[in-house]
Amino acid sequence: VNYDENALANLKLSGSDAKKENIKEVYMDLTNVGGPNKVLMDLNLLKDNSLSQSIGINDNVVAGEKEIPVTIVDKNGENHKALGNLTVKSKVGVGPLDFGFDESRIYFTVTDRFFNGDKNNDDPHGNNYDKKNPYTYHGGDLKGLTDKIPYLKELGINTIWITPIVENTDFNQMFSQGKTQYSYHGYWAKDFEKLDPHLGTMYDLKTLIDTAHDSGIKIMVDVVLNHAGYGMKNKEANSGANNYPTEEDRAKFKGMFRENPGNDFITQESAGLPDFKTEDPEVREKLIEWQTGWIERSKTEKGNTIDYFRVDTVKHVDNTTWKVFKNKLTEINPSFKTIGEYFGADINNDGGQLQNGQMDALLDFGYKGKAREFVNGNIEGASAYLDDRASKISNTNLMGQFLSSHDEDGFLKTVGDDLGKQMLAASLQITDKGIPVIYYGEELGMSGWNGFEQGDQN
């Protein structure tokens, strides 16, 4: 493997004692590939005496044969040693898509709000949306993204992150309250194997991928494994709304949801959305099958497909699921990368997600605050933090810096609509170590407040 790929470490245990109950822990020493000296392997994945986990290669590692020491600690505390081998190759790239994941320049767009390329798919279920309302569908689609590839190429973007593409529920989620709210954002899934009709057709998706790749731009798709949409677990107060999910719609998720939600991050129903029992191996495998299936499903006649996933609600799903998910992605394509939304993460708080077979990168929630400090005059303090941040970032310990997002107040609003401060912060963002993530419209000085009643989603 080269430094922009993941390898799958496979450990085969032998002997009658090679059972989970007889093992205290198993860990790898990844020092020889630029990783930590103790990376635990997840014993929940022990199956048929085998254990697998994805590993990354630091780009400072010299090409050649590398040894991976493995230690198995039995229930009595005794250590048993093993040794794995890995060949690290030099990365040779000649094409416009041969940049490393850590060289990405991401443009994040809420697809429905970007550009309407096909008005025929604006209202597939006859809901008669009021497009002046910020909580309904406005018509942006995949064809609209394709039409604007030249603009994004000129801007210098090499990766487009688009909101989830799976079919979402399409009913007024606030019908019973006399208000309006639809899942234009894509995070309330109805069917994980179908493309949402508001976005267009599979032909449109494949055309976007081919057109982007022809322009040296990769496609990152947002995926959710934590929850489905409202109305997909049981009938709710809004069941009188047009196009409310049917029993047939709900049947595909039978037995997959948590019946007795808890109060912790893993077991709670975030925002009241039906929570998947991802710690159940059957539920986990089904969700991973649905999401990774899009890599083959979206493959074009040219052989192009989705390049990366942005992973939603990482904090709300068990770590074993993320290891299985990453293992599957590595099997499909060693170069397929993920950037996770672990809410509140920064360079000093990755929630245990990086360098252990789970996420390849995390969105950096702490960055915008330090950028704001810098542009407001605390140059020395902010610079010290950013220098320390840069010293800790590598291609295997990677953060994506953003100033604004669909979940938080726009940066420009938080600095009093001062465009000079916005531009200075953007200069920091694009040149700092890590992956710059530009929120759509931000390059034009567009911004808004977060919050349901403020109406600045566009």
Model features per residue range: what roles?
Residues 72-74:
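Conserved structural position at the C-terminal beta-strand
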Residues 57-64:
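Surface-exposed, short loops/turns at beta-strand junctions within beta-sandwich domains
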Residues 100, 104, 114-303, 322-333, ...:
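Substrate-binding/active-site clefts of carbohydrate-active enzymes
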Residues 1-7:
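Short, solvent-exposed loop/linker segments at the N-terminal edge
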Residues 80-86:
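Edge beta-strands of extracellular beta-sandwich domains
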Residues 16-30:
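Solvent-exposed loop/turn segments flanking beta-strands in beta-repeat/beta-sandwich domains
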Residues 26, 213, 217, 289-292, ...:
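Active-site-proximal helices and loops of the catalytic beta/alpha 8
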